[in-house]
């Protein structure tokens, strides 16, 4: 199969979709003019609704670029591939984060430079004094206009009525002003100030860090046996006795190329674009609430049952950045994906003789292949991605398809896995020891690396909001070359990074390093995906994986 035919099929797939994937059922930030000028060029490629002034805080972090030295396998289609005896995972380095020094806070009332915490939040000296005098002297103002006068640094004294109203609206607290006209506020607000200050310091400390360094990883893949001699115990139960009544559409047809589409193509429900989305400076100019939640009371918990959307609303909406809420809307209907894959496996088994069962590796490949179809459909229907031209979409997906598969598998284990088992996309728990005892050393090494990463992410309390952020960071990689709309890709990456940083600091304040630790997992995911690609190619050239599946199409497209 030529690279050109693969590319042509993939283009058609991205344009028209697949009939096999069912549609889901019904589903004023102050800024500096100088800073606006600084970022205007970088935002030139963004659609109009995304061309909002991006303050320094929205560009705090850029995804660390990973330098890899892929140790690929030199083979042709006709060769019987031999895995090197020792295939070394290359070292990974992470570059420093870029950082804008302009972190100056602005008064939420008038936009002047803040001087400290006054009566509930950060304000300037002028508004602090005005608010104090108004409350202590019990002044009553009137507005000669329509009670909506503009309040800024140049005309904050023109209408005291609207100025005081704005003080209240942004969160300045009447009860914080002392009635005895003595200096100082009420002591009960001290803990709030300390907590808010600590959050800001954590945020700045993460940004000012010299960068995160990933220690060199070295995992050796031993020589592989020539074939898979045993089956995994219990895994065939995934293709037996599966109910079909709830499956809306037939599964993917493997009698033809997975890229060929029918005239009736799938249409995804539109998700509203982020018209009201404000770039992320989540902490600055935010009113300090009188009560703060326990550090983990609003944190997402492990979700029971098989649906990534379970527990999605456990956190207060105010603690989840708007962008992350929009990313969550793009998530696929997991029960539907599960049902479709199970139906496909049953159909595959029914098409075979009763004595002829799928091999364990073949069954896993078909699960991964169908999962990859759902991942591509997720990308095609996602915000930002659907605004790219097909050529850019192809380049991004061809770059990261294996990483998205690995990340999907790992999150499934974090959210739904049980001790000593592997949780499959079909909803089946398979005994881990049975897999280890019945598969090749190289496959076991891959599985072991993935399980180690699962343990680390569980210890970090990895949740669904962070999962969707990592998915977008993997998909919108600025490492991809020759993109026509690189500005959009880079802009999405930076905005998702900023939203993820705000989310982790708001919801996990005691885990001060969580944001950095999550980013450190990305090169580890890439390392595992590289090994998985090499292993898949090895199995393919030895005839263990057929040509007519999406996994191999993507593998050849990436290596072309």
From Swiss-Prot:
Sumoylated by SUMO1 at Lys-289 during the hepatic acute phase response, leading to promote interaction with GPS2 and prevent N-Cor corepressor complex dissociation. Residues 17-54 are annotated as: Disordered. It is found in: Nucleus; Chromosome. A motif (FTZ-F1 box) lies at residues 189-208. Its main location: nucleus. GO terms for molecular function: chromatin binding; DNA binding; DNA-binding transcription activator activity, RNA polymerase II-specific; DNA-binding transcription factor activity; double-stranded DNA binding; nuclear receptor activity; phospholipid binding; RNA polymerase II cis-regulatory region sequence-specific DNA binding. Zn(2+) 1 binds at residues 107, 110, 124, 127. Keywords: Activator, Chromosome, Developmental protein, DNA-binding, Isopeptide bond, Lipid-binding, Metal-binding, Nucleus, Receptor, Transcription, Transcription regulation, Ubl conjugation, Zinc, Zinc-finger. Residues 319-558 form the NR LBD domain. Residues 173-188 are annotated as: C-terminal extension (CTE). Residues 547-558 are annotated as: AF-2. The keyword Iron-sulfur does not apply. Monomer; Binds DNA as a monomer. Interacts with nuclear receptor corepressors NR0B1 and NR0B2; repressing NR5A2 nuclear receptor activity. Interacts with nuclear receptor coactivators CTNNB1, PPARGC1A and NCOA2; interaction takes place following ligand-binding and promotes target gene activation. Interacts (when sumoylated) with GPS2; interaction with GPS2 onto hepatic acute phase protein promoters prevents N-Cor corepressor complex dissociation. Interacts with HNF1A. Interacts with GRIP1. This is Nuclear receptor subfamily 5 group A member 2. It comes from Rattus norvegicus.
């Amino acid at each position: 199969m030529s690279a050109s035919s693969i590319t042509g099929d993939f283009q058609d797939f991205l344009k028209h979709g697949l009939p096999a994937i069912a549609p889901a059922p019904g589903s004023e930030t102050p800024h500096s003019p100088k800073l606006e000028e600084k970022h205007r060029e970088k935002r030139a490629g963004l659609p109009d609704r995304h061309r909002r002034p991006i303050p320094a805080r929205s560009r705090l972090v850029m995804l660390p670029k990973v330098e890899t030295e892929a140790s690929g396998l030199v083979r042709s289609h006709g060769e019987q591939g031999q895995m090197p005896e020792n295939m070394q995972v290359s070292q990974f380095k992470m570059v420093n984060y870029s950082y804008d020094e302009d972190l100056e806070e602005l008064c939420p009332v008038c936009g002047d430079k803040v001087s400290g915490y006054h009566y509930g939040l950060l304000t300037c000296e002028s508004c602090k004094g005005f608010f104090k005098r108004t409350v202590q002297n019990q002044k009553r103002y009137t507005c000669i206009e329509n009670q909506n006068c503009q309040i800024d640094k140049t005309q904050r004294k023109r209408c005291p009525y609207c100025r005081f109203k704005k003080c209240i609206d942004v969160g300045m607290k009447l009860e914080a002003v002392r009635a005895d006209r003595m200096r100082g506020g009420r002591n009960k607000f001290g803990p709030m100030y300390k907590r808010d200050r600590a959050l800001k310091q954590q945020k700045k400390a993460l940004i000012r860090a010299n960068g995160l360094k990933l220690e060199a990883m070295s995992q050796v893949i031993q020589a592989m046996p020539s074939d898979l001699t045993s089956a995994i115990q219990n895994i065939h139960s995934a293709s037996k006795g599966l109910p079909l009544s709830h499956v809306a559409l037939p599964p993917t047809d493997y009698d033809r190329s997975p890229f060929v589409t029918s005239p009736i193509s799938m249409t995804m429900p539109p998700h509203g674009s982020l018209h009201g989305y404000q770039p992320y400076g989540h902490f600055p100019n935010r009113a300090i609430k009188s009560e703060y939640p326990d550090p983990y009371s609003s944190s997402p918990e492990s979700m029971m049952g098989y649906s990534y959307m379970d527990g999605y609303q456990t956190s207060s909406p105010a603690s989840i950045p708007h962008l992350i809420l929009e990313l969550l809307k793009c998530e696929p209907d997991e029960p539907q994906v599960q049902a479709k894959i199970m139906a496909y496996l049953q159909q595959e088994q029914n098409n075979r003789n009763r004595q002829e069962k799928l091999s364990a590796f073949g069954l896993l490949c078909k699960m991964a292949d169908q999962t990859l179809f759902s991942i591509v459909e997720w990308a095609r229907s996602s915000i930002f991605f659907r605004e790219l031209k097909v050529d850019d979409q192809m380049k991004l997906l061809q770059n990261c398809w294996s990483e998205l598969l690995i990340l999907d598998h790992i999150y499934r284990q974090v959210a739904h896995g049980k001790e000593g088992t592997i949780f499959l996309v079909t909803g089946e728990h398979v005994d881990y020891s049975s897999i280890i005892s019945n598969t090749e050393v190289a496959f076991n090494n891959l599985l072991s690396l993935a399980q180690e990463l699962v343990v680390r992410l569980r210890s970090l309390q990895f949740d669904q909001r962070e999962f969707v952020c990592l998915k977008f960071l993997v998909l919108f990689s600025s490492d991809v070359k020759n993109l026509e709309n690189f500005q959009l890709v880079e802009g999405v990456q930076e905005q998702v990074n900023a939203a993820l940083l705000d989310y982790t600091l708001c919801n996990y304040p005691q885990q001060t390093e969580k944001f950095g630790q999550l980013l450190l997992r990305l090169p580890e995911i890439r390392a595992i995906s590289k090994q998985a690609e090499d292993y898949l190619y090895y199995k393919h050239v030895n005839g263990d994986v057929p040509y007519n599946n999406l996994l191999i199409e993507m593998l050849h497209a990436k290596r072309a």
